[in-house]
Amino acid sequence: MSSSRSGEHRRNYAQGRNYESSRSRGDQRDRDYREYRRNYRDERSSRRYEDSQRRDYSPARRRDRYERHRESVREESPRRPVEHERNWQPELKHGRERFRERDYEGRRDRKERRDGVSPFSPEGEGLERKREHEKLQAPSPKEEEERPVDQGDKMDGVKEDKDGSLEVGKSHDAMTRTKSAEEEIVEQEDEATAEMKRIMGFSGFDTTTGKKHGDVGQVYKQKKTKYRQYMNRPGGFNRPLDNE
């Protein structure tokens, strides 16, 4: 049986039989699909599929689409300051302080809008004028650092009268009254504790450590060391023994 199979194989090889592989079939299938897509026309637009794909993915169309996207994003997002604009110092204010003040004003305006106060209403105009007045009246940080410190600021609770005499302030009087009240409370607690100990008989008890006395009620014991003799230890018999 094996000889018949080998003979058939030799005959087929001699005749030049074409064995089609699966790879060739797959390539033919891909070519048929590409041909079908090339000749396919859309029913709604009546245009070829390949033409629409070529136009959608062309470099010019991609560039236009990217430019439109950039313009839309630029319009939506607010402009952020550049590095040299952040460090720009208008007048005496540093760039960071200026932007910090701008952020504070933005949060304040949002809070007013949330509370219902419109900047165009009479109340809003009054608040705006009040803020401008406070800005003009408030000293700058450099002026506060350069301003000398008065001696009156250092004296806590002391003020000068018209005639030149010094009067103790209310804060100093309040602190003195508080301290005296605390001392009185402590003294009252000590007196109450001593009275309770005296009534219950605890006031006569005290420690007897290190005291010499002859009272029978008080005990003071002094322990004396005694040595024992060990026969199985070297030098045990040389130790002096107690006289018993």
Curated annotation (Swiss-Prot):
GO CC entries: nucleus; U4/U6 x U5 tri-snRNP complex
Organism expressing this protein natively: Schizosaccharomyces pombe (strain 972 / ATCC 24843)
Subunit structure: Part of a tri-snRNP complex.
Domain of life: Eukaryota
Transmembrane segments: none
One term of GO molecular function: RNA binding
Protein name: U4/U6.U5 tri-snRNP-associated protein 3-like protein C162.01c
Compositionally biased intervals (Basic and acidic residues): 1-11, 20-116, 126-182
A matching Pfam family: SNRNP27
